[in-house]
Each structure stands twice: as C-alpha cells, then as structure tokens.
Amino acid sequence: MKYDYIVVGSGLYGAIFAHEAKAKGKSVLVVDKRPNIAGNVYTEKQEGINVHMYGAHIFHTNDKRVWNYITQFAEFNRFTNSPVANYKGELYSMPFNMYTFNKMWGVVTPEEAAAKIEEQKKEISGEPKNLEEQAISLVGRDIYEKLVKGYTEKQWGRDCKELPAFIIKRLPVRLTFDNNYFNALYQGIPIGGYTKMVENLLDGIEVRLNTDYLEHKAELDALADKVVYTGPIDAYFGFKLGTLEYRSVRFENETLDIPNFQGNAAVNYTDRETPWTRIIEHKWFEFGKDEDGNDLPKTIISREYSSEWRAGDEPYYPVNDEKNGQLYAKYKELADKETGVIFGGRLGEYKYYDMDTTIASVLDMCEKELG
C-alpha cells in the first residue's frame, strides 16, 4: 500500500494534519513511537479521572477559527484556570489580583494596592540587569520574594540574579478580584479527556504505535510520497550539527484514598525549599465528577519537578536563547532542502507553542499543502 502522506507523531499537529488530508481524499499513515496516541496532550483514565499524563493542559484561545475547529471533535467544559500559590503555608490567589494584595498587605481598595506596588517598584532604578531586578521593577519586592523568586529558580535551576531580564517580560497585575489566569475568550477542557478528542480526529485513519520513524526511516519513506514530521528536528538529522536543548519536567503521580487533596486543580509551591514546583489534582479539571455526574471517591495528584534536560529525556520546552536559536536556524536550512518533508509542531519547529497556536499553525500549513 502506497500512501500520499506519512505523519510522524500523533499529537495535535500530526492528528489535525492527518484528519485534514483524509478529508481531502488523501491516504494517510500515522506512526508514533509511543504506545499511545495524542502526544503530550495524552490523558489516561484512572479511578474514573482523566489524568493529564504529560502535565496540565488547559485549552484557552482568543482565536475564533481555532475554537470553532477544535470543538467539532470534543465538547469542552467551562473549566477556568485559577491557580493558588502556596508560600510556606500562606495561600495566595493567582494571577496577582486584589485577593493577593489584600492577603499580602491588608489593602482593600485598588488605589491602595496600586500605591503599595508603585512604592515597592522604586527600589529598582534604571534598566534591570537580571530577572530579579526586572521582577521587582514590575511588581515590587514583597510579591517577588514570596511568589516569583523560589518558583522561578526551581523552574530554571538557577538564581534569579543569574537569569536574563527578558525571561519575564511582564507580570500581569490586576486591580480587580479576577482569578481567571488566562485572558482568553474561549477556555475549557474536553469532556472525557484529550485522548478521546484526538481519537475523533484520527477516526478512520491507520495508526501504527510503538513505531520509531527514525529507526525505520528508509522502509517507511518508501511507503509514501510525502512525510509530515513532528519529532525533534535535530534528531531527524542525526544531531549532526549538535543537540538542541530543552527544559524538561518530571512528574510523580500518586493515587490517594481521599476525595479531595488540595481543593484546586493547580497549586504552585513558590518557596525554594519545597522541591516540586506545583501539584496538579486532576479531578478538578472536570469538577471532581465522573461522566455521569457522580462524585469520585479517590483523587490523583501529580507533583511536578523541573529538571535539567539530558539527551534521552522527554523534551518539553525549547530553550529560547541565542545559542539554541542559532543552532535551530542551521537545522532549519537543512530542513528547507529536504524535499518531500514538512517539519511542524513544537519539536519540528523548535518553538514554544500553546495548543491553540499549534492548531492555528497546522491549519495554515494544511491550506498551503492541501489547498
């Protein structure tokens, strides 16, 4: 059997391309080296709870085209991301808003809060030289010390004084009682989990799991006219120019015989001493209920740790610095010469994509490629 396209990777980018190609009458084979579909949005049902196996994925977008597209494949619930920050047992609302400022300083009005922040920002004069100075110049010393410093240092594995200022371009400050983390018009979680949504995208398409494309490249390439490759771009070229770096995340999952561990989907641990950056309690993405609306007796939590990425680790976040940017540009030159191969997605383009920008990017590519 000869296919029009082989799609490498069954995450959002690969699954949407495969769906659109099939809709245009093309024959498609999807291969994925994992034992499951859906890439990093993969959810697995355990104890009646859809567990986000590769970290919390909360869909949010202002792009109506993207929302109208993806809601064909899943009904979304009304989940709103309102994380809580835990600093040594003190709980604060995120993002920084009037609840946060009231707890921090006892201020009651937006005017009092604004005055307090302005007064603390004055500590930094001139151009901030590092992330610490940048953060203080945006939100002041108290918020920086309790809610930014420890969390950021755990995430990057480095002191805030050693991190470049540009990492934090802005820290949203809200002088309202609005706990909604995202400023997005559309937001939610697919009811029944992301895996079900990706299954709907791949309906009627041949998928081969546990199949490493790069190990079987010659025989798979012979099966198709074109390849859509969503794996790491440096791996495609055998790392011959060097290895692109990522930040990685490690998860420790635990099932607990209690109905409620922390009362919220996400709690960030913002002190330096707690080794994890946050704890996700998955049942709250779907309001603690199963599909029939029953309360779930158990709960599943994931402790999240940031870790230095080593070759072979799961790549999560591309490192947005000059060295990696220059190396990617060299790989991109090679990729542009690879006729018959389209590189796409977070790993294929070495680019930090949210889910909605991934969808927008693949839909644009489909228009160009499939017409």
Annotate each PLM feature.
Residues 24, 214-334:
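Mid-domain catalytic core of redox enzymes
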Residues 3, 25, 205, 223-225, ...:
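Short, well-ordered alpha-helix to beta-strand connector turns
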Residues 41-51, 59-113, 171-176:
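A conserved beta-strand/loop capping segment in the N-terminal third of enzymes
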Residues 3-30, 366:
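N-terminal Rossmann-like FAD-binding beta1-loop-alpha1 element of flavoenzymes
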Residues 85-92, 99-226, 230, 235-237:
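Active-site/ligand-binding neighborhood in enzyme catalytic cores
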Residues 19-47:
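Glycine-rich FAD pyrophosphate-binding loop
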